[in-house]
């Protein structure tokens, strides 16, 4: 049987371990639910992304430590896919719904809506929270009215 002093030490140790674990999880930037931050939204929203739309998106993907693992901005070639049909990770299918053409969003995607426990080696480890800076370029081949007017000049 444990003495009350030993029990108090054990409880104190478990409490310290719990606090350190929570502090590390918070510090690491991991999230458990999808977080969508709108960084820029055009004044006029002519086109919004809906399930089944073919959309073009520029993106920069990072890990929580800031390591960039992919960037269409660097390549100058946005990705094109049908929204909401599983052609991309679930965090994108959910995180880009309702975005306006020209809108910039920051998506913090938990592992369960990204690449899961397996990751996408070698650049994305298993269980990784992903951070994407995105810009919706076009919906069904149509750019924003702002982009159209710039091209007409």
Swiss-Prot record:
PROSITE patterns to which the protein is assigned, alphabetical: ER_TARGET, FKBP_PPIASE
Principal location listed in the UniProt entry: endoplasmic reticulum
Disulfide bond entries: none
Record InterPro entries: FKBP2/11, PPIase_dom_sf, PPIase_FKBP_dom
Gene Ontology cellular-component annotations: cytosol; endoplasmic reticulum; endoplasmic reticulum lumen; secretory vesicle
Residue ranges annotated as motif Prevents secretion from ER: 150-153
Keywords per UniProt: Endoplasmic reticulum, Isomerase, Rotamase, Signal
Any one GO MF annotation of this record: peptidyl-prolyl cis-trans isomerase activity
Single GO BP term: chaperone-mediated protein folding
Presence of the UniProt keyword Isomerase in the record: yes
Residue span(s) of domain PPIase FKBP-type: 52-140
Primary role: PPIases accelerate the folding of proteins. It catalyzes the cis-trans isomerization of proline imidic peptide bonds in oligopeptides.
Family indicated by similarity: Belongs to the FKBP-type PPIase family.
PANTHER family: PEPTIDYL-PROLYL CIS-TRANS ISOMERASE FKBP15-1 (PTHR45779:SF6), PEPTIDYLPROLYL ISOMERASE (PTHR45779)
Name of the protein this chain belongs to: Peptidyl-prolyl cis-trans isomerase FKBP15-1
Native source organism of the sequence: Arabidopsis thaliana (Mouse-ear cress)
Gene coding for it: FKBP15-1
